[in-house]
Amino acid sequence: MIVLAWNCRGLGLDSTVGELRDLIRYHNPAVVFLSEMKKKARAMEKLKWSLGFRCGVAVDCRGKSGGLAMWWRDHLQ
């Protein structure tokens, strides 16, 4: 099982989201863990679905720091 963990230091730029998309496409992880997203959990829900993950949890950032997300493929349930 492949797990991708990344301290992305913010997902506000399209280029950073593109990098994440490329990493997921290349490695095809079963689980993705993101730290320092600097985004609200609600905003991460749309990205999670667009990247092919249906399951996951997220913790809101506080101001412009923090934020965590863990996504997994639905076959892991």
At which residue positions do the language-model features occur?
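Short phosphate/oxyanion-binding micro-motifs
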Residues: 1-77
